[in-house]
Design a protein with these regions (language model features):
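Residue(s) in the substrate-gating loop at a strand-loop-helix junction
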Residues: 141
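Conserved glycine-rich cofactor-binding loop
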Residues: 9, 16-17
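Active-site helix of classical SDR
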Residues: 121, 157-158
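Substrate-binding pocket helix/loop in short-chain dehydrogenase/reductase
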Residues: 94-98, 102-110, 207
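Short, small/polar-rich loop/turn modules that mediate ligand/substrate recognition or access, typified
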Residues: 176-181, 237-239
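Short C-terminal tail/terminal secondary-structure segment
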Residues: 95, 234, 239-258
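A short, exposed helix-loop element centered on a Lys and neighboring polar residues
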Residues: 121-122, 167
Length: 258
């Protein structure tokens, strides 16, 4: 199927590695020019940009001024901007129960995930006011759908993205851009640098127990779902939806068998 992305332009945040890098490569393979956002890994972003004929743009999306400037910079470099993928985020690897969760970590996690996504979305919505159309894809997580013990900060941020933020955005954006769409991709456990060292044999058995497909996702699995939602042809009448890429996951296995 032709996704209608040839000749379009997209911005992918958090694209210097992992899922973001796979998203950028997938969109480029469909013919889009891609602005590859990075916060600190400039070398990886520039290498990827060279590989896919894209552009690398650095910004700290927790900083309002830098986030506001990112979309105009992408438009300046690409000449247009049809899609924006708000992928940047951080999963804190250390398990900390809520009763012991420091306020500093709570704030840090929400800033890196929810605030960064809000600022990216706000900047893109300001852009589509002048174009009347576009696709915004927010990357959330199954942690935001089912909760995640030991990572309540991350789960809360991703739940806010997938529900309150996305649903408000899809209703607001059409007031100024009649053909703009907002959707969410919610990956489950995915093989990526962020989960490196976490997916032990024991963990794999535990996390796949509620998945009919009994496997974790690849970054490319997530990227293809994003490309579908970014498509003006395949998903041109799709807005306000959450596409879960988690092998049919139905929830959490809270207790070990037996």
């Amino acid at each position: 199927m032709d996704l209608g992305l040839d000749g379009t332009a997209a911005l992918v945040t958090g694209a210097s590695g992992g899922i973001g890098s796979a998203i950028a490569r997938t969109l480029a393979a469909e013919g889009a020019r891609v602005a590859i956002h990075y916060r600190s890994n400039r070398a990886a972003a520039e290498e990827l940009a060279a590989d896919i004929d894209g552009v690398a743009l650095g910004a700290d999306l927790r900083n309002e001024d830098e986030a506001d400037a990112l979309v105009p910079r992408a438009v300046e470099r690409l000449g247009r901007l049809d899609a924006c993928v708000a992928n940047a985020g951080v999963w804190p690897s250390q398990d900390v129960p809520i009763a012991r969760l420091p306020l500093e970590r709570w704030r840090t996690t929400l800033d890196a995930n929810l605030t960064a996504t809000f600022l990216t979305a706000r900047a893109y919505l300001r852009h589509v006011e002048s174009t009347g159309e576009g696709s915004l894809v927010l990357v959330a997580s199954t942690a935001g759908l089912f909760g995640e013990a030991g990572h309540a900060d991350y789960a809360a941020a991703k739940a806010a993205i997938a529900h309150g933020l996305a649903l408000s955005l899809k209703n607001e954006v059409v007031r100024t851009a009649a053909h703009a769409r907002v959707n969410v991709v919610a990956p489950g456990w995915t093989v990526s640098p962020m989960t490196e060292g976490e997916l032990t044999e024991e963990t794999l058995g535990h996390v796949t127990a509620t998945m009919p497909l009994r496997k974790v996702a690849t970054a490319e699995d997530v990227a293809r779902a994003v490309a579908f939602l970014a498509s003006p042809t395949a998903a041109g009448h799709v807005s306000g939806q959450i596409v879960t890429v988690a092998g049919g996951m139905e929830g959490r296995l809270l207790h070990a068998p037996g």
